[in-house]
């Protein structure tokens, strides 16, 4: 999935076309980010106040799509809005032109007074409102997001009638554990690859990024959690954190970090 943001239908249509050309299966519009910079561009969570405009945007995106599904990520409201009143209205107006999948962060967003980080934790969760949306609109795909810290917690909410649950930070910080649980739930085999194999397969991608002017730490900072909960995790993080930001850092930094982990693990056997 490719997530995009904006409030100009023509620009979002063009972004959708580019996403389709790149091979994405899903193009998601962000109606949830509360940061000042995002608000200044008139997109993100502030658009919860403009459901008619969001409807125009997703209509333009659907018309531009050559196969990718158009989906929406939103909050339950912003600032002093009453979620039980405005969220159903928002969903109804945005879905009337054929968008049927909504990932709902079950918190309000405060557009001032809280940082984006605080907006992920401080506003109270309202899972029941998201469940009510699904019960009253069974034809829509409703996916819960926000505060889901374990795989079991996500499955519990799905089993109460939702179509899915989105785990964000936990999946980012401990991807292998989440992937293993997902394989068990969906009877798939994605986790048969070892972490070592995944890292090895990342190397050509990293090299291509470097060859086109990118920096190593732009990728490795998203790989820090690969050994979470395993021996060698600290060495992995420390090696990447200390070396990947350097000007001429290349794939050898990742290879050395992996070598350090394997040495640590072998010493424990």
Residue ranges of model-derived segments:
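Proteins enriched for Cys/Gly/acidic motifs involved in redox and nucleic-acid/cofactor modification
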Residues: 41-43, 51, 203
């Amino acid at each position: 999935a490719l997530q995009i943001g904006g409030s100009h239908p023509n620009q979002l249509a063009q972004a959708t076309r580019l996403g389709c050309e790149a091979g994405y299966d899903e193009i998601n519009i962000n109606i949830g980010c509360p940061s000042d910079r995002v608000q200044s561009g008139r997109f993100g969570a502030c658009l919860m106040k403009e459901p008619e405009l969001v409807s125009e945007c997703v209509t333009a995106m659907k018309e531009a799509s050559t196969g990718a599904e158009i989906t929406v990520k939103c909050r339950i409201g912003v600032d002093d809005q009453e979620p039980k009143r405005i969220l159903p209205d928002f969903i109804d107006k945005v879905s009337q032109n054929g968008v049927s999948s909504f990932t709902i962060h079950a918190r309000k967003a405060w557009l001032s007074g809280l940082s984006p980080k605080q907006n992920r934790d401080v506003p109270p969760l309202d899972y029941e409102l998201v469940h009510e949306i699904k019960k009253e609109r069974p034809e829509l795909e409703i996916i819960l997001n926000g505060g889901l810290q374990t795989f079991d917690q996500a499955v519990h909410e799905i089993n109460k009638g939702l179509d899915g649950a989105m785990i964000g930070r936990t999946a980012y910080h401990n991807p292998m554990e989440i992937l293993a649980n997902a394989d068990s739930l969906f009877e798939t085999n994605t986790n048969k690859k070892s972490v070592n194999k995944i890292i090895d397969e990342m190397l050509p991608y990293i090299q291509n990024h470097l060859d086109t002017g990118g920096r190593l730490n732009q990728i490795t900072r998203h790989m820090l959690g690969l050994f979470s909960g395993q021996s060698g995790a600290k060495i992995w993080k420390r090696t990447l954190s200390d070396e990947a930001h350097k000007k001429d850092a290349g794939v050898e930094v990742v290879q050395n970090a992996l070598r350090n982990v394997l040495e640590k693990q072998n010493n424990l056997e």
